Amino acid sequence: AEVIKIERPGVGDPRRSIPPFVENNGIKKAGGFMAYNRNKKSLALNIRNDEGKNIYQDLVKNIDVVVENLRPGSVDKLGLGYHDLKNLNPRLIYAAISGFGRLEGYEGPDSKRPAFDIVAEAMSGIMHLVGFEDKPPSWTIYGMADIYTGLCTSFAIMQALFMRERTGKGQFVDSAMLDNMLSLNERMAMLYSITGNEPHRGRLTHLYPRGAFKCKDGYLAMNVPDDMVWARLCTTMGRDDLINDERSNNGTARASNAEFLAPIIEEWLSPKTRSEAETILNQNGVPVGSVYTAKDVFESKQVKSRKALVNIDDPDVGTYQFARGPVMLSGSPEIETNPAPDLGQHSYEVLSEILRYSDDKIDKLAESGTIEIKP
């Protein structure tokens, strides 16, 4: 897809000003912006003045999808919301990302509230389950709700595009961070609905071993889902006596006696490196994986074989590696990646090639401050 990012002239996306930064020959760029805006084009456009609004509306007539995640109601005040734009382009797919949803008839009392990533994690029940029972709730990873909501929104956009092929009509895509994170927390909803009980933070009441166990050089992640895998683990450790022990002969018993079993497992693991233990256990039918640091991930043969980290060559600050998209297609396993744009880098290109504006008109728009063109 050709993605055009609308940014404020002179300011740009706030992410451009958030560390960590890369500097070279007096040029400073934000790592987060570089990572999250690959393959996009930057149009620096002031949509708050009449000229800017007209340009935006002209663009809408010529594109397939609008995606925005501004505070609910802000674009409507400018006359650039879905109901305004669908009249200009009935085939338009308009995707709105918000904290709590905007679809008419389904707004709820929180629909106009702003929200950040951690708010969605908290109010979806996820934070309540992350961490340990004797500690405060914790978050998952930085940006989980942002990232997952973006993925869900992209899937929904593709659904809407497919439906448009059948109906010829566009539609409004309402993507709420709360809804997306609740769908990710489906197990909690199922457990509470079926049992009426609150799930326990940091542990399951019917499964064990499950978690990170200490080895000689780090930690090994292990999940034993049933008694068959438990028997394999016991045999591998030379502890067949634990297979039928009443303290460990089923998942519920093992979960109740985790404090008894954890030292036994770690005693077996302690003289072994992660790699050694991983090899032995996987060969014996106990799926495990090393808990990798960032350095481990970058050095992983599996990651390298999958080309899961791609080189991004920025002409100003050099080459860096970022994670590629999560899915590969056999018809196009490797997609060309371009560096994140400078502010206004594609303003002239977009206005001249898509809207067929003359050079004179573009120059006047730049002089008035309606657009910004990278020097």
Q: Which residues fall in each region the model found?
A:
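Short, well-structured beta-strand/strand-turn elements
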Residues: 3, 282-296, 357-363
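Glycine-rich beta-alpha junction loops
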Residues: 10, 99-101, 177-182, 217, ...
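Short Gly/Pro-enriched turn/cap motifs at secondary-structure boundaries
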Residues: 24, 33, 200-205, 210-212, ...
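Conserved Rossmann-fold dehydrogenase catalytic segment
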Residues: 102-103, 134-144, 165-179, 199-205, ...
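Oxidoreductase and adenylate-handling cofactor-binding alpha/beta cores
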Residues: 128-131, 150-170, 183, 187-193, ...
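Aromatic-enriched alpha-helical interface/lid elements that frame and gate functional surfaces
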Residues: 208-284, 288
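Terminal low-complexity tails and localization/encapsulation signals of metabolic enzymes
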Residues: 214-215, 296-375
